Amino acid sequence: MFRGSHVAIVTPMLEDGALDLDRFCALIDFHIEQGTDGIVVVGTTGESPTVDFDEHDLLIRTAVSYADGRIPIIAGTGANSTREAIELTVFSKNAGADACLSVAPYYNKPTQEGLYQHFKAIAEAVDIPMILYNVPGRTVADISNETTLRLAQIPGIVGIKDATGNIARGCDLVQRVPDNFAVYSGDDATALALLLLGGHGIISVTANVAPRLMHEMCTAALSGDLAQARAINARLFKLHIDLFVEANPIPVKWAVAKMGLINENIRLPLTALSSQHHELIRKAMLQAGITV
């Protein structure tokens, strides 16, 4: 079971939109040095909707090869086609990823039974630990707690990233899942609350900008040091909110670029952060102790 702070890592790109693998590898080193507990590659924050199959495979293989066992690599493999999701999951398995993160199918609006059959088919087709990803604000499809509990009985499905931000719902889930099934927060602003209610970790956007603080907050919360966890979260809270002033990953790419780690380049239909929001993000970074 993975525990702690897992960064939903950005995908660096060159001016022409090509992948910047040199900076990608440098980011992996940065997160290892900063204490990040795991890396999610090609998730929402990694611009998965605009990364093609070959690039997807390349990013996962590069991450696994370069990390070389120094940090767990979790591969984003979701798609709104079950067949494509299986293919992406096969990529991850063959590349040697430690687990996959599979988002609920978006746009085609499956029923709860459709969601169950989708994830069941992937788990039965590919032998790799699978973390479900529920983010109805993006997908429209919402994996209910009851469906999650059904899926938790399937071998290979080991956890869920709950990005609903609904604490009551997360608390209900934590209390009812099997002991070998992990619940991860996918919403930085409410992550501490879920951790204190029994969650196992975070898959975080903020960790791109403040990886050591996110690791320390998770460690404090999971060890019962409430005062320390609350103090760190207070420093980070403005980042948690303001990194979503525009669609993720627009603001976080700007922030990581200002740290000198990547170029701000982003693929259409996403565009660079509006200048009116630059100072907002800068102030949030300064509040967290990040000099820009």
From Swiss-Prot:
<keyword id="KW-0220">Diaminopimelate biosynthesis</keyword>
<comment type="pathway">
    <text>Amino-acid biosynthesis; L-lysine biosynthesis via DAP pathway; (S)-tetrahydrodipicolinate from L-aspartate: step 3/4.</text>
</comment>
<dbReference type="InterPro" id="IPR020624">
    <property type="entry name" value="Schiff_base-form_aldolases_CS"/>
</dbReference>
<protein>
    <recommendedName>
        <fullName>4-hydroxy-tetrahydrodipicolinate synthase</fullName>
        <ecNumber>4.3.3.7</ecNumber>
    </recommendedName>
</protein>
<dbReference type="InterPro" id="IPR002220">
    <property type="entry name" value="DapA-like"/>
</dbReference>
<comment type="function">
    <text>Catalyzes the condensation of (S)-aspartate-beta-semialdehyde [(S)-ASA] and pyruvate to 4-hydroxy-tetrahydrodipicolinate (HTPA).</text>
</comment>
<dbReference type="InterPro" id="IPR020625">
    <property type="entry name" value="Schiff_base-form_aldolases_AS"/>
</dbReference>
<keyword id="KW-0028">Amino-acid biosynthesis</keyword>
<feature type="active site" description="Schiff-base intermediate with substrate">
    <location>
        <position position="161"/>
    </location>
</feature>
<keyword id="KW-0457">Lysine biosynthesis</keyword>
<feature type="binding site">
    <location>
        <position position="45"/>
    </location>
    <ligand>
        <name>pyruvate</name>
    </ligand>
</feature>
<dbReference type="InterPro" id="IPR005263">
    <property type="entry name" value="DapA"/>
</dbReference>
<feature type="site" description="Part of a proton relay during catalysis">
    <location>
        <position position="44"/>
    </location>
</feature>
<keyword id="KW-0704">Schiff base</keyword>
<comment type="subunit">
    <text>Homotetramer; dimer of dimers.</text>
</comment>
<dbReference type="GO" id="GO:0009089">
    <property type="term" value="P:lysine biosynthetic process via diaminopimelate"/>
</dbReference>
<keyword id="KW-0963">Cytoplasm</keyword>
<dbReference type="InterPro" id="IPR013785">
    <property type="entry name" value="Aldolase_TIM"/>
</dbReference>
<feature type="active site" description="Proton donor/acceptor">
    <location>
        <position position="133"/>
    </location>
</feature>
<dbReference type="GO" id="GO:0008840">
    <property type="term" value="F:4-hydroxy-tetrahydrodipicolinate synthase activity"/>
</dbReference>
<keyword id="KW-0456">Lyase</keyword>
<dbReference type="GO" id="GO:0005829">
    <property type="term" value="C:cytosol"/>
</dbReference>
<comment type="similarity">
    <text>Belongs to the DapA family.</text>
</comment>
<dbReference type="Pfam" id="PF00701">
    <property type="entry name" value="DHDPS"/>
</dbReference>
<feature type="site" description="Part of a proton relay during catalysis">
    <location>
        <position position="107"/>
    </location>
</feature>
<dbReference type="GO" id="GO:0019877">
    <property type="term" value="P:diaminopimelate biosynthetic process"/>
</dbReference>
<feature type="binding site">
    <location>
        <position position="203"/>
    </location>
    <ligand>
        <name>pyruvate</name>
    </ligand>
</feature>
